[in-house]
Amino acid sequence: MQPLTLTDLDAELTDAIAEDADKATFDRIGAHVDRLDVRPAVTLHSAALWYASQGLYVFPLTPRTKVPIKGTNGCLGATDDPDMVNKWWTGQPAANIGLATGHLVDVVDIDGAEGQRSRVKMWADNFEAIDNDALAKVCTPRPGGMHIYLPATGDGNKAGIFPGIDYRGRGGYVVAPPSVNDQGAYRFFGPVNLGGLA
């Protein structure tokens, strides 16, 4: 029987990591996620405006990349001002969304199978409360990739807190849904509780 929800697929992914599954298994799980994406299409422009309306700071990234568009000053120029967001995305409607961390949200950045193995160990050993504190979870296009949005702590970025896991805080950023790259789309799964943080 095939998994029916993203929560089921998250559990299947965790099992696959524990069993050190092959790439084909991760590709199959990713294909199931793609088939379950039945939400209405949202433009990058409207998504950037929604983030800004929640008080989150955004800035445009070069289409299909995680590189800030030249002249925007990257996360240092990030804003929640709807006029600036409109100006940026009217001029570059295919621009991906950079979401500055450290202001309202921080992000645990889990990178691929190595990060997922660390996640399983991390949750079991140290951070059982992280799932309860999560404001949102994002599947990234890389197989096994995930972002977990948490309330901001005021801490800065920390690379390699565990193998395959980085912490994005003050001075950092992540690529936000529904941005895309050559491997696929960034997507929320599970509850999204980013409203009312400001």
Language model features: what each stretch is:
Residues H147:
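Histidine-centered active-site/metal-ligand motif
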Residues Q2-A11, D15-A18, K23-G144, T153:
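Signature for HUH/AEP ssDNA processing cores
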Residues L99-Q116, K121, L150-A198:
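DNA replication initiation modules
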